[in-house]
């Protein structure tokens, strides 16, 4: 066993002595040592319950004849961090999480790992670590929360609260109505109830093969999640016995399948960023062109909040992620069904008995929302390395208008609230990319303000930053190269005409190459917003969004 490095041989007597101080007995040194990588944090509702959850995982690991050791990672609640400097720490926290898991696991020579993530950057951070460490691993997330209901019976979620602010600001609802939405938008523990980033990533974890069926959709408060814990411990033991590791599971074909699910269910645009980062950790050459190819062959079958009033509980009731996978598997060439997963079985075996139980929630291949995926990759002179739009969250397929430029999210939100944006405009928020932000903050506040003011179908928004999974409307993000790297978005001027063509996958500014070259020669990179601390280091090391915004290792040659 890998853990023999710290527990076998006369020279490891000091190590065993220290381990006995934690409560171990001599007989425990013949069992696998399992890292329980938890993320219990009281300020995050999706993680509030994970302390008790972790206890159940440890019990299940002991019952399977292994020895658990629990530790916790950090985490950032994107909703609470929204709209201030906290959002600059969100994406960078992914790297800290990956590094911290790598540090603890490799320093102590664990034989296997169970990861307990739930919310936005915690899940991809742990997934990156799992691929980097490459020991047998199973993920079991904390699960989504249920949707809420106002005193009038209206179904609401966190997206409703953000949009309620814009609605109140524009006089569409009263302060009492906003308070009612606030009080009921997040009714319990669990990841926010729509197809936002956290739930999108936990669903992708399931199809990638790192988590068990049900991981993405079973609610946090559902007793079936405890059964999932027991299965996770049992499956981990099998993975250890068969020496099946994350890099055996997460192949190029598995990532294809993850994006196939993503396109079918209309997941968050952040999945593109995080899955490209996973590919980097797995040593795979996977780019946005391949994502686009998947998008072209997979139909969009689900519209979940913020694209509709359906929520994760409805997806679960309708058959869960396995039902979506089973349906798209009917189309030839969409899924790679014979690859191994964390169950010890193939994807084909995992979904064999799945079926759609509500075709209003999960559409059939014969009745898709669209013939192509719910996410699209756009390119053009405004995004030479690519950009992402959640096409399933807007009915508008082509938009052209003059740009209204803001050089930060704060500037943009203030401008929107002051009425500087009108019907037909293209809002541009730049210098908010991985390097320029720094940290590539999410633009949920501006998109929610636009939607709440009733302009969701009449105003487009472009940014080199990110969008929350709760964002909707004509929102194009991840524009690469970013403004801080001298990308075309940095060269835009007030009133330039921008064209977004979702069907043709184009993002263009109606300015000649000669004029753009002239502007580029005159452009000067703004001074870095942050020069010290973690964000200062991050800004120096981070790569572009089109490569997952991972950190680059300096060349020491």
UniProtKB/Swiss-Prot annotation:
Active-site residues annotated for this sequence: 468
Q: Name one GO cellular component term.
A: cytosol
The cofactor binding remark recorded in the entry reads:
Binds 1 [2Fe-2S] cluster per subunit. This cluster acts as a Lewis acid cofactor.
Q: Which molecular function terms from Gene Ontology are attached? A: 2 iron, 2 sulfur cluster binding; dihydroxy-acid dehydratase activity; magnesium ion binding
From the UniProt record, list the coiled-coil ranges: none
**What EC number(s) does the entry state?**
4.2.1.9
Quote the record's binding site residues for [2Fe-2S] cluster: 119, 192
Which cofactors does this protein require? [2Fe-2S] cluster; Mg(2+)
Pathway the protein acts in: Amino-acid biosynthesis; L-isoleucine biosynthesis; L-isoleucine from 2-oxobutanoate: step 3/4; Amino-acid biosynthesis; L-valine biosynthesis; L-valine from pyruvate: step 3/4
Q: Which reaction does it catalyse?
A: (2R)-2,3-dihydroxy-3-methylbutanoate = 3-methyl-2-oxobutanoate + H2O; (2R,3R)-2,3-dihydroxy-3-methylpentanoate = (S)-3-methyl-2-oxopentanoate + H2O
Q: Which Gene3D superfamilies match?
A: IlvD/EDD C-terminal domain-like (3.50.30.80)
The record's keywords, sorted A to Z, are: 2Fe-2S, Amino-acid biosynthesis, Branched-chain amino acid biosynthesis, Iron, Iron-sulfur, Lyase, Magnesium, Metal-binding
Fetch the InterPro entries from UniProt. Dihydro-acid_dehy_C (IPR042096), DihydroxyA_deHydtase (IPR004404), DiOHA_6PGluconate_deHydtase_CS (IPR020558), ILV_EDD_C (IPR056740), ILV_EDD_N (IPR000581), IlvD/EDD_N (IPR037237)
Using the record's annotations, give every residue carrying the modification N6-carboxylysine: 121
A single GO BP: isoleucine biosynthetic process
Q: Can you tell me which family this protein belongs to?
A: Belongs to the IlvD/Edd family.
Described by its record, this protein's role is as follows: Functions in the biosynthesis of branched-chain amino acids. Catalyzes the dehydration of (2R,3R)-2,3-dihydroxy-3-methylpentanoate (2,3-dihydroxy-3-methylvalerate) into 2-oxo-3-methylpentanoate (2-oxo-3-methylvalerate) and of (2R)-2,3-dihydroxy-3-methylbutanoate (2,3-dihydroxyisovalerate) into 2-oxo-3-methylbutanoate (2-oxoisovalerate), the penultimate precursor to L-isoleucine and L-valine, respectively.
* Oligomer status and interactors: Homodimer.
HAMAP family attached here?
A: IlvD
Listed name of the protein:
Dihydroxy-acid dehydratase
- Source species: Bacillus cereus (strain G9842)
């Amino acid at each position: 066993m890998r853990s023999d490095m710290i527990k076998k041989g006369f020279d490891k007597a000091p190590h065993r002595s220290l381990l006995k101080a934690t409560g171990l007995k001599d007989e425990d040194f013949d069992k696998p040592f399992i890292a329980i990588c938890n993320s219990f944090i009281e300020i995050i509702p999706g993680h509030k319950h994970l302390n008790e959850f972790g206890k159940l995982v440890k019990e299940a690991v002991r019952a399977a004849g292994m020895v658990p050791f629990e530790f916790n990672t950090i985490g950032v609640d994107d909703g609470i961090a929204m709209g201030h400097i906290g959002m600059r720490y969100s994406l960078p926290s992914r790297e800290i999480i990956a590094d911290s898991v790598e540090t603890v696991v490799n320093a102590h020579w664990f034989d296997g790992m169970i990861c307990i993530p739930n919310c936005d950057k915690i899940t991809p951070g742990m997934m990156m670590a799992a691929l980097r460490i490459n020991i047998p691993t199973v993920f079991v997330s904390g699960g989504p929360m249920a949707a809420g209901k106002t005193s009038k019976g209206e179904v609401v979620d966190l997206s409703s609260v953000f949009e309620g602010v814009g609605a109140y600001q524009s006089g569409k609802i009263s302060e009492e109505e906003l308070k009612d939405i606030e009080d009921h938008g997040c009714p319990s523990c669990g990841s926010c109830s729509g197809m936002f980033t956290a739930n999108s990533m936990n669903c992708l974890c399931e199809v990638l093969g790192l988590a068990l069926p049900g991981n993405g959709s079973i609610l946090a408060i559902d007793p079936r999640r405890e059964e999932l814990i027991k299965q996770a411990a049992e499956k981990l033991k099998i993975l250890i016995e068969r020496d099946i590791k994350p890099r055996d599971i997460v192949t190029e074909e598995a990532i294809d399948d993850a994006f196939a699910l993503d396109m079918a269910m209309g997941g968050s645009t952040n999945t593109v960023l995080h899955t490209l980062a996973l590919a980097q950790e797995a040593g795979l050459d996977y780019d946005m062109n391949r994502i686009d190819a998947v998008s072209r062959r997979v139909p969009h079958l689900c519209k979940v909040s913020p694209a509709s009033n359906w929520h994760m509980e409805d997806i679960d009731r309708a058959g869960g992620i396995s039902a979506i996978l089973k349906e798209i598997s009917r189309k030839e060439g969409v899924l790679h069904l014979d690859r191994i997963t964390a169950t010890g079985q193939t994807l084909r075996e995992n979904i064999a008995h799945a079926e759609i139980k509500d075709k209003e929630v999960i559409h059939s291949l014969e009745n898709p929302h669209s013939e192509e995926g719910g996410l699209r990759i756009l390119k053009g002179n405004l995004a030479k390395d690519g950009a992402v739009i959640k096409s399933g969250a807007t009915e508008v397929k082509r938009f052209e208008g003059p740009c209204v430029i803001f050089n930060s999210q704060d500037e943009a939100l203030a401008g929107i609230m002051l009425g500087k944006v009108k019907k037909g405009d293209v809002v541009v928020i730049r210098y908010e990319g991985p390097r320029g932000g720094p940290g590539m903050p999410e633009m949920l506040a501006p998109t929610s303000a636009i939607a709440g003011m009733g302009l969701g179908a009449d105003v487009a928004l472009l940014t080199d930053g990110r969008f929350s999974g709760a964002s909707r409307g004509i929102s194009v993000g991840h524009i690469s190269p970013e403004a801080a790297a001298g990308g075309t978005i940095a060269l835009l001027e007030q009133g330039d005409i921008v064209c977004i063509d979702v069907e043709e996958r184009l993002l263009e500014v109606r300015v000649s190459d000669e004029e753009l070259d002239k502007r580029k020669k005159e452009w000067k990179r703004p001074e870095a917003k942050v020069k010290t601390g973690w964000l200062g280091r991050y800004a120096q090391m981070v790569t572009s969004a089109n490569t997952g915004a991972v950190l680059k290792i300096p060349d020491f040659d």
